[in-house]
């Protein structure tokens, strides 16, 4: 937690709790630690499975709104074939973005690929890195953030086309972006 606090002062922090119940004890034991890091992070990505384990009796949407109020600028919740919930500090409404429509082969690495594509897109949009970028992310509109979200979703969609934790290239992602004008932002 000390390392996260130090980094939060200098620049952006991204966090994926990547819940592994066998390593964390009970939800009641894990929840305070996860919430402390969420409050320090700028970008948070969790899966619906992570949230159902941490908060078994609460609607996911309520948890995401509570997390957003604790400090992050951008929160995503991946929901497999049901797409991604997205909340930002600057926009009032929750957005739901559909997944890429592809034939599933293997979900290993899908969440990590989504986060990699998202972070890459946010860096390209100059919304990550410095304290100034951190403030821009906090104030960013959907128009500024959606291209990075689409990049993340496409990256994840390509990953699940292959067996194992496949990592798509930027060229593979850009091919899909070029083919679909609605994804370019």
Residue ranges of model-derived segments:
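Conserved phosphate-binding/catalytic region of the ribokinase-like
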Residues: 56-185
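Conserved beta-alpha-beta core of the PfkB/ribokinase-like small-molecule kinase fold
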Residues: 1-66, 72, 82-84, 89
